[in-house]
Amino acid sequence: MEDDEEETTASTLRGKPRPPPVSAQSAFSYIPPRRLDPKEHSYYYRPARTGIISLYDCIFKRRLDYDQKLHRDDREHAKSLGLHVNEEEQERPVGVLTSSVYGKRINQPIEPLNRDFGRANHVQADFYRKNDIPSLKEPGFGHIAPS
């Protein structure tokens, strides 16, 4: 009779937690704990590198040093410090960012560079620099006043 009884512990007394009611759940509420999709399905076109950090570590094991470059040092990625935006952008097959820095594909040019008329541009600039052109000295549009 004593062998049939289970050992009473705190976990057996608590029991299983009850799931929330159906009315509290959304159709889009399920988020998988870890995505194992190929890198082609991700926004950054690279496999996910997420670490598991417990809530205890987030609260009680904070870094105590001071970073003077951050506006507030409780923000982890303020001013994009610690992020690898340029590497992520270069790995994508199609650029997403439209800034002047990351939107240009220097290593993947759209068309090959054409330097055939470089000498013509150089001669034209040299001609306008050396010759006295009256239209540039007359008052009006494009007038250059000597100082």
UniProtKB/Swiss-Prot annotation:
Any GO BP annotation: flagellated sperm motility
Self-association and partners: Microtubule inner protein component of sperm flagellar doublet microtubules.
UniProt keyword Cytoplasm, yes or no: yes
Keyword Cytoplasm: yes
Gene Ontology CC annotations of this record: axonemal B tubule inner sheath; axoneme; ciliary basal body; sperm flagellum
Listed InterPro entries: CFAP90
Stated name of the protein: Cilia- and flagella-associated protein 90
Underlying gene: CFAP90
Lineage: Eukaryota, Metazoa, Chordata, Craniata, Vertebrata
Ranges for region Disordered: 1-36
Keywords, comma-separated and alphabetical: Cell projection, Cilium, Cytoplasm, Cytoskeleton, Flagellum
Subcellular location: Cytoplasm, Cytoskeleton, Cilium axoneme; Cytoplasm, Cytoskeleton, Flagellum axoneme
Domain of life: Eukaryota
Protein purpose: Microtubule inner protein (MIP) part of the dynein-decorated doublet microtubules (DMTs) in cilia axoneme, which is required for motile cilia beating.
